[in-house]
């Protein structure tokens, strides 16, 4: 605050209310700043008439982010102009969604009374914050991604131990877990892709949301920077407060039934998350489902690099859905099913019975096309039960929401009847839809009109015959409206004025309009209210009485309809849990029917799954995404056999030319294993697969500029992660290990990594490389074999056959690839000369073949290093 304040101007409006004497602001701005003080971490949108306006620094931010015009408004005689921007009230959801997507919290301060009443009493209209929108607490369909969960996460940490809770408040799902090692926490966060992550801290600026990439000393450096982090007070995350909140919320005396009684960090994270939901949802009570506890090793572990490299839900190139595994497999009919499929693919099963239950259902639907098609047709008529139930439970659902849910509930009976034909586990689960849900649906449909309006306080919601008082009020109102409709005719007859009209506006209500030239003919009971250029407007005592009656009756009618509707909505909310239970069964059968559809049209087979470890035996396997992109018949299928205990190699050295399909083959094997453990059929002729605990991939690398790591360092970090976590039950897919450094360094590392995987870990491994020297490993280790991707050499070109066959390749055809890419002919010629000299001088293959495998790399590397400088001079002609 300054002694001589500088007035804000149109060009330089006030942007920081904290520097001003707030007593000199207008009453509206005083209230605005009071509200803003309570929501400092949010952008405040403040209802003024038909607009939501924002002021000061919020206006600057919103104008920039939404590309709106920054203008100004008078803030007081001694304040001057204040920075302002605004959005129309009918476009609020669209603009608020854009702000939330950019990582901002948005507080909606709306009018909570009729502005006309406040104006009549000559006071400021009452306003309150009715919504606080943050990235992780959205419930409105218009702001949510339909086909994926919108998770809110919370973390509690002590040194390297951590608890992680996550919830989707739009569906009510609520989970928690506890583990150690912050790298594993990062992996789990990257799987969940939460929209917002809560971090307890003692920082003074709590309640602020840190947007993606925004640095903070309060965020552990091991955690991904791609999320919004909200700094929260430590208090709700204390064990005592968090546990009590969970016990109170779920009305239990112990957390044993939820599986987290002995997991203090999991409890703290879950309790802190619940407190945040309560804080942001204001008067709306979000119906969260009972907490479920899980472990990181309860499912097949896929780290972030594996999910990325296998392109499970988005492509590596541009992050798009098209071209991902999810794109290739998603034939679901409901948004619930689409979300479930996404979760299944990111958390494949380890439980053989669970996998086989899904396979059994797919197989039954595969062999019964009529049942499959009838199910899919009926599923298309079912709305998003999970999210509709969430909004109904939170008392934010519209009449359309409630009607949509009810229409879906009555269709569940048809779904159950169809499921009676089935014998597999997931079809049986649908045969037992609770009959009270059908009755609930019929009850709602008997109360709410078929196409209700969006707004629930404007009437026309409730059917006739539901409430006698409502019917009487409607009839009375209809009679009065009919009197108004007849008034124009009767008054024309009485006065003889043919162009007399009945009109209405907000300022004067109903009136009788006469041309000014006929005003002398106005009857004595006409009371003049307004004179215009070409007309005179009148009222009569009877018209005024009818008007008062009509307006009062309409308001009373709307209020009664609203009360009846809220009773109906509350009745539905009481059945939230059984509805959600059925919704899970519906989503699951939707996923399985869709997977059966894919299996039929893409020619998939049911893999034989076994708990006995160590076997991958795939006949004529195909890449599920690439084959759909190429079209039927164009993809070249290949076999894969791994598992030394089953007379196959544990590790395959895969060589072949650039662009021949090695990386595609690696991904193909990984995706087939993942799909099989999801319970899906797979793109192959036949397959027998052991259940694996983890899939690791290292396919390609780029510099990590954010952390200052080179391509080679990124590659080494990823490789170290694999070697430190892989087990004999894992599947490891490696592509081009060691290529980011000097040739001999890279070869030495590639050799030792392959040797370690085959000898120490004995994981099922495919090791794609251009280091043909690695083919020598097969002569040294009995569980290693060489395979190659073949080509056909012609005089002027090479043809990629994309066939994986036994034996090692002795050429990479890199120079040919360069020629095909258009390198100058002189460069190609010189490259061939250099290659000839390299092949002439390099003796590493001979050394590897003759030496002891435990010592050969050290001696050979030393010898090569000693000759390196001389060789380089010879090679390049110096």
Swiss-Prot record:
Pfam families: MutS_I, MutS_II, MutS_III, MutS_IV, MutS_V. ATP binds at residues 656-663. One of its GO terms (biological process) is mismatch repair. InterPro entries: DNA_mismatch_repair_MutS, DNA_mismatch_repair_MutS-lik_N, DNA_mismatch_repair_MutS/MSH, DNA_mismatch_repair_MutS_C, DNA_mismatch_repair_MutS_clamp, DNA_mismatch_repair_MutS_core, DNA_mismatch_repair_MutS_N, DNA_mismatch_repair_MutS_sf. GO terms for cellular component: cytosol. PROSITE patterns: DNA_MISMATCH_REPAIR_2. Keywords: ATP-binding, DNA damage, DNA repair, DNA-binding, Nucleotide-binding. GO terms for molecular function: ATP binding; ATP-dependent DNA damage sensor activity; damaged DNA binding; mismatched DNA binding. The keyword DNA repair applies. PANTHER family: DNA MISMATCH REPAIR PROTEIN MSH1, MITOCHONDRIAL, DNA MISMATCH REPAIR PROTEIN MUTS FAMILY MEMBER. This protein is involved in the repair of mismatches in DNA. It is possible that it carries out the mismatch recognition step. This protein has a weak ATPase activity. Belongs to the DNA mismatch repair MutS family. This is DNA mismatch repair protein MutS. It comes from Synechocystis sp. (strain ATCC 27184 / PCC 6803 / Kazusa). The gene is mutS.
